[in-house]
Amino acid sequence: MRFSPSLEQGRLLRRYKRFLADIELASGEQMTIHCPNTGSMLNCMREGGQVWFSRSNDPKRKLPGTWEISETPQGRLACVNTGRANALVEEALRAGTITELVGFTALKREVAYGEEGSRIDFRLEFEGAPAYVEVKSVTLGYPDTAVAAFPDAVTQRGAKHLRELAKLARQGVRAVQLYCVNLTGIDAVRPAEEIDTAYAQALRAAVADGVEVLAYGTRLDAEGIVIDRRLPVLLTP
């Protein structure tokens, strides 16, 4: 995924009302940009920290700028635009980068499924046998470790998705939880037990029921983002 044009850089002044952020450009100009992330953005939101944003030429947009990347306190880069994860994964699926999911004959997005009113990110068809793939974007890192964690806040919705995947797996349907790690300098992923114990327990239960868990890392900068490597998932605390 290439950013065209390249991202512009600024300094974060504040984030507020969930969807808004004020930044200062190198020229000293201040502007308000859209924040496409409804989560806590723990570790990705530091006043005075460097941020990168895309700029739209659409005259109908009230805010032309969209926050894309943050520099974390550890000096890593994190893609905070959660909408990028599914696009990155689809790009990688079609390119054959995610080797565990190579060979599908059709791809459908946002397919309704399950008993709790869920929508799966991707349904892949493999010679008549489907695979259901749920994508989560990972941006939470910690000092002195190259292990990222998910989630960065309590997520009942995330636990619901794991329950739905587990039900599919128990029925013999291929079900996959895929973590897209949009954070540089990471070698592995784990559930953030210290933030959401219920999610961590749901993940381990889903694996016991047959859900496949995959994690892939990205390479990212102001020019673009690409999924480039498989990462291990550490399930035990």
From Swiss-Prot:
Transmembrane portions of the chain: none
Gene Ontology MF annotations: DNA binding
CDD domains, A to Z: SfsA-like_bacterial (cd22359)
Pfam families: SfsA, SfsA_N
Signal peptide coordinates: none
Homology family: Belongs to the SfsA family.
Protein name: Sugar fermentation stimulation protein homolog
Origin species: Pseudomonas putida (strain ATCC 700007 / DSM 6899 / JCM 31910 / BCRC 17059 / LMG 24140 / F1)
Gene of this entry: sfsA
